[in-house]
């Protein structure tokens, strides 16, 4: 399988060269180990998926570091987080940079551990599945922000995405871009590995029930998070569902998009929206077995929206930026039948709010951006250019402050 160059590589190299310790987080099989082995060949490697390695790190840490000298890459470090105290001691006794690279698939858990043990000593980055830019070899690596300057710069490197539904269905895990990899077999193995290596260590749930839960969540990608509704489908308590959702979030399977809130928007809904990080995994769990059936299905709109949101998040993480405090959605409690009290995404940057609509349409209308004016109520922010990301062929202004963009502009 040929190595696909990852967009975040220059960011990681810069951070390794300037910090004593660098943490790379991301879901299983997004390519963390492959990237580190390919780009940081001088680092020794220890994998905490291996129980004997973990045991030595826990019980005989001095011997562990003698057997695994720096510069050292520790994979799946969350499986033995006690090692962080030893790493803290080592980095505090040295002025060297680039001593440790750590990786793991439990993002929030790891970030908590780092803040407790390695605060101020570690640089944190996130690796996601392949972006469309990476799949198509686009070198442009700025986060999506619908300014005139961004659109003009992005337009210079546009590549047409001819097989968009094939990629939505396939998903973004790098191994799937090996021409011989069977889609169903890959995801069957992925789910089994996820249950065995991650879930068994985090919850006391049988595999069948948790898989039923995964399927119920996948069927709701792009929807407001409703714990009670999922609990009814799975047959477990609502507190259990809340705990399990938090585990999916921690392990990079789902993302909870928070609502935009401001004192001027008193009627805004406060519930997060739930998105699967990978559309291929969501398709597998909900049994959409071909791209053609998915494209024509009742879930096509939600799956398309999930894909676009994921691509925007990737554009941030691939530039080394934290998107959690920039990207939101808005929905008012007085939502009407035409949906004119809802904005799919609100992107905030430098005191400007950019309303973004996501439409599975090749013929967008100006009315699709009708809710944008609600942001004018936020007096301490400006409203920026409104955007409709859709399946249109070329950039088209629908009115002076609203533009329809092909998804290739992400």
Located regions from the model:
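Interdomain hinge/linker elements that couple catalytic modules in large macromolecular machines
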Residues: 137-303, 307-313, 317, 325-328
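A cross-kingdom feature that marks ATP-driven nucleic-acid transaction machinery
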Residues: 1-3, 8-9, 14-23, 27-29, ...
